[in-house]
Design a protein with these regions (language model features):
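Short, charge/polar-rich alpha-helical segments
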Residues: 7-17
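Sequence termini and other peripheral, non-core segments
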Residues: 8-9, 22, 47-228
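N-terminal interaction modules that seed assembly of large macromolecular complexes
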Residues: 26-55
């Protein structure tokens, strides 16, 4: 049983659909008080954080929908979301586990990052949607790191940032930046949540169809859908 803390875009088909099933299993174990897996590390980790587990479910579902999988088992997030502080494995170790698991096999939508710059390029629009100041600071920090492997503290910081909701203005700002890579002609739709969802869907379709790697390998391509 495994609930990952990395963005679901790093998971291949088997891992993505497997995590979705295991989240539902965990919810059943905890909510119905079942004994099976009651002492599993993931059960202990999420027992007091069910709303956060349900938010992770929404993140997984957004990635599933981006890849064309149907979803017919919704859950409802009610009340505040408090994420567990503990990890079964820290995020940097989770990258290593995925690298071992995917050796010679189908990878995820987003390639496992070989450098801090690759990691940042994959996360930058998700960060921009949440905190422009952090976006600028992290961009400068990563530029100075060059092609060095992703440092543990950066991997952790990005994983934690993606748990936070974006701001309304940040969402639009990030989507407008992403739209700049795929627009052909015409303006942006007017402000409003429904219009922003339509804008993201247009970005998703064009990025995948045209093979624009910079966007197709971005966490934001599914991450932002959770909040629209």
């Amino acid at each position: 049983m495994r609930v990952w803390d990395l963005h679901p875009g790093y998971l291949n088909r088997q891992s993505l659909l497997g995590e979705h099933q295991e989240i539902h299993a965990l919810l059943t174990i905890v909510e119905e008080g079942r004994r099976g897996y009651a002492h599993h590390p993931e059960t202990r980790r999420w027992r007091e954080h069910l709303n956060a587990l349900k938010m992770r479910h929404e993140m997984v579902v957004a990635e599933m929908r981006l890849r064309g999988y149907r979803h017919q088992s919704p859950v409802t997030v009610q009340g505040p979301v408090c994420w567990p502080e503990a990890f079964v494995d820290p995020p940097i170790r989770q990258f290593a586990l995925l690298a071992e698991r995917y050796r010679g096999k189908e990878p995820g939508r987003i390639p496992l990052p070989r450098s801090a710059q690759e990691l940042w390029a994959q996360h930058k629009y998700s960060v921009l949607a949440r905190d422009p100041e952090r976006y600028r600071a992290l961009g400068q920090r990563v530029a100075a790191a060059g092609s060095a492997p992703p440092p543990e503290d950066l991997v952790l910081e990005l994983a934690m940032l993606l748990r936070q909701p974006p701001t309304p203005g940040g969402l639009r700002n990030a989507l407008e930046h992403m739209w700049g890579y795929v627009h052909r002609e015409g303006g942006l739709p007017p402000d409003g949540r429904a219009e922003l969802r339509a804008l993201l869907e247009a970005i998703q379709e064009r990025a995948v169809r045209a093979g624009i790697r910079y966007l197709a390998e971005s966490t934001a391509l599914s991450d932002l859908a959770v909040w629209l």
